[in-house]
Amino acid sequence: MDQTLSKEERNELMDLLQITRAAWGNLSMMKKAYKNVSKLYHPDKGGDSAKMQRLNELFQRVQVTLMEIRSQCGSSSSQVAWFFWDENFRTLGAFLGEKFNEKIIGLYPTCTKFVRANCNCIVCLLKKQHAGTKKNLKKPCLVWGECWCYKCYLVWFGFPEDFTSFRYWTLLMANMDLSMLKLWTELGF
């Protein structure tokens, strides 16, 4: 996601969204904040039209760039969908329902540290996707959003590899749109 906006623009967007700058990259939180502040800034509701215009410009650039980045990643036959940015996108958590906690990781911490070839937990699937992306693009994953695996999350946000960081990552994954993860084929679709 670092490729989407300059540092100054990222800070400006997060300020316009009225959420902490540390939340940059938390797409679910950013999307929810966008919906809330759009009502606040909308000129028809007495808001600031200049802020609304700038918010739309920056947020649209994030959307377009992220879609382009994700369309080049992974091995699933699914495409990144524009409907992620719509209101009723289907999240991984909603899709897996009560099985989310058992499907997110097969064996903690083993799956976070090693690729388990026969494991189909989300951690291992995303780790395999990460390896495929690196192989296909002949470069490492450089930004959060190009890859959603746990290791890239740790590197991108600078978090330690511990259970607390893992739980925060699982919360992001629970609220992540299935099409953004590009795991349709791997999940049996």
Curated annotation (Swiss-Prot):
InterPro entries: DnaJ_domain, J_dom_sf, Papo_T_antigen, Papo_T_antigensf. This is Small t antigen. The lineage of its organism: Viruses, Monodnaviria, Shotokuvirae, Cossaviricota, Papovaviricetes. It comes from B-lymphotropic polyomavirus (LPV). PROSITE patterns: DNAJ_2. Disulfide bonds: none annotated. Its main location: host cell. The common region of ST and LT proteins comprises the J domain. This domain is essential for multiple viral activities, including virion assembly, viral DNA replication, transformation and transcriptional activation. This domain is also required for cyclin A-transactivating activity of ST. Residues 12-75 form the J domain.
